[in-house]
Amino acid sequence: MSKIVIITDAWTPQVNGVVVCIQQTVKHLRKMGHDVFVIGPDRFKNIPCPTYPEIRLALFARKKVFAILDDLKPDALHVNTEGPLGIAARSYAHKNKMRYTTAFQTRFPEYIKARTAIPLSWTYAFLRWFHKNSERVLVPSKTVQEDLIKWNVGKPEVWSLGVDLSTFQPKKRAARKKKVYVCTSRLAIEKNLDAFLSLKLDGEKWMIGSGPEEKRLREKYPDVKF
C-alpha cells in the first residue's frame, strides 16, 4: 500500500470542518491499508492567526518541512491548505519534481475581504499561483468547483464529504409539531449567517455553533434558538 502525507495548517487541537474532514479521511485511508502521516503546525514554532487565533501559523517551516518529507519519502503528497506549511510543501514538491494534490475548503478570498479592504481579485490571483501545478484541487461541492472554474483556479474536483451514520441517523426523528430549520456553523462573519437567520420560515430556526459573531447574532435574532 501507499505512504501518504497530508500537510495542513489546520489541525488539532483546532475544532473545525477542515480538521474533521482530514481526520475522517485519515481514518478511512488507514482502514484501506495505507500508511498516512499528517504534518500540522503543532510540530513547529507557531503564532495565532490574526482575526482567527484558533488557527496557528507555523514559523520558519520550510527547512523542517523539507527534512520531514525527505525522511518520510511519501508515495503521495496532499497539500491541504494555502498557509505557511502548504507553501513549504508545495515548494518541496516542485524542487523534487513530485506530483501532488491540493484542497480548497475555506472561502479564503471572501474571508479576507470580509475583514479587510483587500479585493477578491488579489487573493484569487494568489490561489491561481498556489494551485496551478497541482494534479487536482479537491473541493467540497459542485458550487465551489464552479466558483474556482470561474476564477480560473487550478483543476477543481469535487471531494464529496460523507455523513457519520453512527452519529447522525435521520430515521430517528423527534416528535415535534413545528418544523425545525437547522444551520450548523462556526458563528463568524464570513459564514453569511444573516442570510439564513433573516428568512421568514414556517417553523423554528435553530443555530448550532459558536464563534465571534455569537453575541451579535443572539441580540439581533432573539426568536432563534442558539
Kindly label every feature range from the protein language model.
Residues 42, 143, 161-162:
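Carbohydrate-associated surface elements
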Residues 1-44, 72:
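N-terminal subdomain of nucleotide-sugar transferases
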Residues 4, 76, 93-111, 138:
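Active-site proximal beta-strand in glycosyltransferases
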Residues 214-226:
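Nucleotide-activated donor-binding/catalytic signature segment of Leloir-type glycosyltransferases, i.e.
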Residues 160-169, 188, 212:
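Short beta-strand->alpha-helix junction loop in the catalytic core
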Residues 99-101, 110-129, 139, 165:
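Nucleotide-sugar donor phosphate/pyrophosphate-binding loop at the beta->alpha transition
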Residues 172-208:
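Conserved donor-binding/catalytic core segment of Leloir-type glycosyltransferases
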Residues 65-86, 96-101:
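Short N-terminal targeting/anchoring amphipathic segment
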